[in-house]
Swiss-Prot record:
Residues 27-43 have a biased composition (Pro residues). Residues 72-90 have a biased composition (Polar residues). It comes from Oryza sativa subsp. japonica. Residues 1-116 are annotated as: Disordered. This is Protein SPIRAL1-like 1. PANTHER family: PROTEIN SPIRAL1-LIKE 1, SPR1. The keyword Magnesium does not apply.
Amino acid sequence: MSRGGSAGGGQSSLGYLFGGNEAPKPAAKPAPAAAPAPAPAPAPAAAVAAPAEKPSPAKADATKQIPAGIQGSRSNNNYHRADGQNTGNFLTDRPSTKVHAAPGGGSSLGYLFGGN
């Protein structure tokens, strides 16, 4: 058997994809279209009333348009800021681990390194 050659066997079942050796079936002739039904007569103009215009609802206060949970004074800042009773060191009351001195400056670790 050569490379890319057929090993024989039955017909491909992929004829529907690649166009089998069958001749296409002729399309059935559509039945002649029946004459369209006559359109109903339009209703008299007096029976059709123009819809009454509804007054537009009053504009709501702009401060009421802010979604719940967003303070109006900070509406231009999308980042969450924790402010409330559960902020700070309320759990452990430990001092912060934040660096309070500039690099090379004063250090609170003098007891380790023999500070002045």
